[in-house]
Amino acid sequence: MPPPAADAPCPEQAFNATALKWHTCAWLLLPVLVFLAGWMHWYAALPLTLLTAAGLAPRKRKEPQKKNSLPSFPLFTRSSFFVLAAFAALMIFSGWGEWVNQHPDHIVRNACLRELVSSPWPVIFPDGNVLIYNTGFWLVPALAGKLAGLDAARVLVVLWGTWGLFLSWLWLCVFSGRRSLLLALLMAAFGSLLNLQCWLGLNLFRLHYFGTAEQIMCSANASIPVLLFFIFLASGRMPLY
């Protein structure tokens, strides 16, 4: 059977949505588990970890019979690898990994990763102050950095963000019912209406907000988890389920 086109119709079962859900839960929850283990006493971390595991435990439910379902096809096709590579390039050229010129916001981001890699957890500075920041995005890469060094942590930051973007794209495909490269482009390029307003020379009220690409450049640590969570949530509300 010839492989489907890049925008071939794609119901949930064609993605092996169970595996996709587990990948998404792992991406969202692994930093939480690392935080529980690294920042909290065991008598607080253990019950919270057990509660998290209980919430993820599969439950038996009656599944509606599916009719006329299309045969599943491999997820990792050439088009999928192209999207994965494009997201990796987006992360790298946005400054993550510290290999290209960075937005000034990365001064704080880089320092956060270095402290998480080099300092014991929880991070307490010599003057008694503690590291208070939205550190979740860096925790898994920083844990790898403690084992393999800061360079390994930088590489994993890029890979971690790339995988989060890739999962977001997959859930967009589930949401729309099609595996489409255009969805990846729209997701990455979705931006402010202020650009259109400026191009047309309209002196109206400001329609500005930070687009996806700008958010990834400045704050992928905050924007990618939110993007993935809400696309995942919206996809779960589709009539397909």
Question: What residue ranges belong to the model's regions?
Answer:
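Structural signal for the C-terminal ends of transmembrane alpha-helices
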Residues: A37-W39, A53-K67, F93, C173-G177, ...
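Membrane-interface transmembrane helices that cradle and orient dolichyl/undecaprenyl
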Residues: P11, I224-Y241
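Membrane-embedded, hydrophobic transmembrane alpha-helices
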Residues: M1-L70, A188-L194, C198-L202, R206, ...
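Hydrophobic, membrane-inserted alpha-helices
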Residues: A26-F35, A86, W138-G145, F166-L167, ...
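Membrane-interfacial entry segments at the cytosolic side of transmembrane helices
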Residues: N68-F76, R178-L181
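Alpha-helical transmembrane segments of integral membrane proteins
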Residues: K21-A26, R78-A85, L183-A184, N221, ...
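Helix-loop-helix transmembrane hairpins and adjacent membrane-interface loops
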Residues: P74-W99
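Active-site lumenal/periplasmic loops and adjacent helix-entry segments of GT-C-fold
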Residues: F93-L228
